[in-house]
Structures are given as C-alpha cells and as structure tokens.
Regions:
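Active-site micro-motifs of SAM-dependent methyltransferase domains
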Residues: 194, 260, 301
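C-terminal helix-coil-helix/basic helical segment that borders enzyme active sites and/or dimer interfaces
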Residues: 228-230
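Extended, charged catalytic domains and RNA/DNA-binding interfaces, predominantly
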Residues: 1-226, 237-244, 251, 273-282, ...
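Mid-to-C-terminal alpha-helical segments outside catalytic/metal-binding sites
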Residues: 269-305
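Short acidic/histidine-rich active-site segments
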Residues: 223, 247-271
C-alpha cells in the first residue's frame, strides 16, 4: 500500500534510547516502513524545552544530523526527500521517503534567520509552538488567548518565503486563526483531530478545520488516544467520518504522532499497522480513490512539486 504519515517523534526517541532507525522498539523504524511497500514519513525534530539543559538549537542540529546519518547508513531502505517528485522517485526505487519537520519554533530560537538553516536541512514545515508559549504565539494550553505576536507574523511570512509550511498543531485557537488570516498559502495541522468529536484543546474546531481546508492545507489524523477520545477503532473512525463530512476529502491525511505518545488508538501499535486502519475504513464503504487521498495524496499535494 502507499502511505504518507506527516508526523512522528522517532528522532527524539532514538536520541534518548540510543537506538537507530533501521530497527528499534518504538513505533517507527525503516524495516517496518519498507514492509508497507511505499511509505513516506515526516520525522519531526522535537524537544521539551522545560526538560532539557542544552540549547534547543543544538538539539535540533543533533536530531537533523541523526536523520541524515541514519539515512546514509540505510540507503538500501530509505531516501531523504523534500518534494513530491522526490517522494515518488523514492517509491519507484523501492525505498521509504524520509522528510523532516520541526516541532516548535523555539528549536530555531524563534528566529526567522534560522530558517535558512531549516531550508538547508530540507525541512517541510515548522510547528510554531509545542505545548509551551514562545515568542511567536500562545499554545493551546499555555497562554491560550494569545494570538500571533508581531515576530510571529514575521516568522510565518519567512516560512512561506522559504517554501515551508506553518503547522498550527499545538497553537492556541487565536494564533491558528491569525496564521490562516494572513492568507499567504496553505496552512497545515500535521497531527490534530476534531474537537467536535473529542473536546480536547489540542483538537481543531470545525470552523478552523474548514479554514485550513479552504487554504489548501492538510490535517493529519492523530492516533493518540487522549485526542481520539477512546482507544478502539470506532474512535478513530468517528474523527475520519466527521472531518470528511466537513468536506475534508482533499484535506484529511495521516499524522499519527507515532513515538510522540504512549497509547495509540484503533489497535495500532506502530507504523506497520496502518493497513489495519485502511481496511477498517474500506470496510465502512470508503472507496479506494478517497483512501488513497487520505493515506498519501493529500500530503503529496502540499509538498513543493
């Protein structure tokens, strides 16, 4: 099957455990990705700023270096990519496509000049905050009434100028709307669900989902049980059904938050179980064209060509 997952925290996990990407005990490794047939994975650079003692930018550099090193060591299985064309070329060569995202602009010191480095790393998107507010914006749980600051607006403009996407996952509702209202291009939520289905502040209101839809962006389905509101496949399907009912055929994608949470829903234990989700949705009558959009094509559409 063809599968494109837009968010995992496997790099941070590998840094913590000393494991590599070829095979490990987490949710994502290259061997399991290869078994899917055609897989693309956006690996997020991530650190909890409240729990580390070194400069965040240094952590970002080390995690980026880890990805490059692991891709070089495992060139039989994986190819580094940024554009849709290179993802398709990796698949044609029988390899997993590995892409890079950055979860939390604090990892770039909230400095638009650091985006030159992120662009050189072939970064696809930057999540503007994690759970802590920063110089750019409030988060969903820290300063939740704070929208984009003036530096935040400048940072978003610089993102688009560098052909990267702003990710509003973790942002306050006010800040997410500020990003949308700038009207500069597609807006994404790489790993978020429906607040109407599960009333968690990390999830998107219907109006915000529709605004992301209208921007031409994508929303990656998050498999963390706390954001699903249950641990069974029915909980996952409820979010899919609701977001598709909002006209999300070209918006809804995958963003499982693999290796970023302890408990995944739907009986999924890792990337190898995405076919289980595909089968569950097919059994509910969703046709192959729609499932291909959800499982791969919607992410491909928002990448640079």
């Amino acid at each position: 099957m063809r599968c494109f997952d837009g968010h995992c925290d496997t790099l941070a996990r590998c840094m913590a455990t000393g494991e590599g990407l070829r095979q490990n005990t987490g949710h994502v490794d290259l061997a399991r990705c290869a078994a899917l047939g055609q897989h693309a994975q956006i690996f997020a650079v991530f650190a909890n700023s409240a729990a580390v003692n070194e400069p965040l930018y240094a952590i970002a550099q080390r995690q980026h270096a880890l990805l490059e090193r692991e891709c070089a060591r495992n060139a039989d299985l994986v190819r580094r990519c940024r554009t849709a064309r290179y993802v398709r070329a990796a698949w044609a060569a029988g390899k997993t496509a590995a892409l890079l995202g950055i979860e939390g602009a604090e990892l770039l010191d909230c400095n638009p000049r650091r985006l030159d480095d992120a662009a050189a790393w072939e970064c696809v998107y930057v999540t503007l905050t994690w759970n802590h507010a920063n110089a750019l914006a409030g988060s969903h749980c820290d300063a939740p009434m704070q929208g984009l600051t003036a530096p935040g607006r400048d940072f978003v403009r610089a993102l688009y100028a560098h052909r990267m996407l702003p990710d509003v996952s973790h942002l306050s509702e006010a800040a997410a709307w500020d990003v949308v209202r700038l009207g500069l291009g597609p807006v994404i939520a790489s790993h978020a669900n429906s607040r109407a289905v599960c009333a968690h502040t990390r999830n998107l209101s219907d109006d915000l989902f529709c605004a992301i839809r209208d921007s031409g962006g994508v929303v990656g389905l998050n498999l963390y049980t706390d954001f699903l509101g249950g641990d069974g496949m029915d909980a996952v399907v409820r979010h899919v059904e609701h977001l598709l009912d909002l006209g999300g055929d070209e918006t809804l994608a995958l963003g499982g938050d693999l290796d970023g949470c302890d408990t995944l829903g739907g009986g999924i234990t890792g990337v190898q179980d995405y076919p289980t989700l595909y089968a569950a949705l097919a059994a509910r009558g969703y046709d192959s064209a729609l499932l291909q959009a959800l499982f791969s094509d919607n992410w491909l559409r928002v990448l640079p060509k």
